[in-house]
Curated annotation (Swiss-Prot):
Gene Ontology CC, one term: cytosol
Protein name per UniProt: Translation initiation factor IF-1 2
Subcellular location: Cytoplasm
Lineage of the species this protein comes from: Bacteria, Pseudomonadati, Pseudomonadota, Betaproteobacteria, Burkholderiales
Gene name of the encoded protein: infA2
InterPro entries: NA-bd_OB-fold, RNA-binding_domain_S1_IF1, TIF_IF1
GO molecular function: ribosome binding; rRNA binding; translation initiation factor activity
HAMAP family on file: IF_1 (MF_00075)
Species this protein is from: Burkholderia vietnamiensis (strain G4 / LMG 22486) (Burkholderia cepacia (strain R1808))
Length: 87
């Protein structure tokens, strides 16, 4: 059996929810629920509200997606690094 086809879409994180879940607005205006992929959790990649992300959506359920990539924008906020004091 072949692996199911996935749709790759870009969106912007609107809200960070508990349990590593997010509310994302896609480029076409549709709002979907999403979760961070295992690779992103393993590498401690932080996703904040306002970040531009790439999602994978199943063709069977277009209301939930998996965040695969957080785009690096020059104006996106950066979380403080561990061990550094804020000034």
């Amino acid at each position: 059996m072949a692996k199911e086809e996935l749709l790759e879409l870009d969106g912007i994180v609107d809200e960070v929810l508990p349990d590593s879940k997010y509310r994302v607005t896609l480029e076409n205006g549709v709002v979907v629920g999403a979760y961070a992929s295992g690779r992103m959790r393993k590498n401690h990649i932080r996703i904040l509200a306002g970040d531009r992300v790439t999602l994978e959506l199943s063709v069977y359920d277009l209301t939930k997606g998996r965040i695969n990539f957080r785009h690096k924008d020059a104006n996106s906020p950066r979380p403080p690094r561990a061990g550094q004091a804020r000034r």
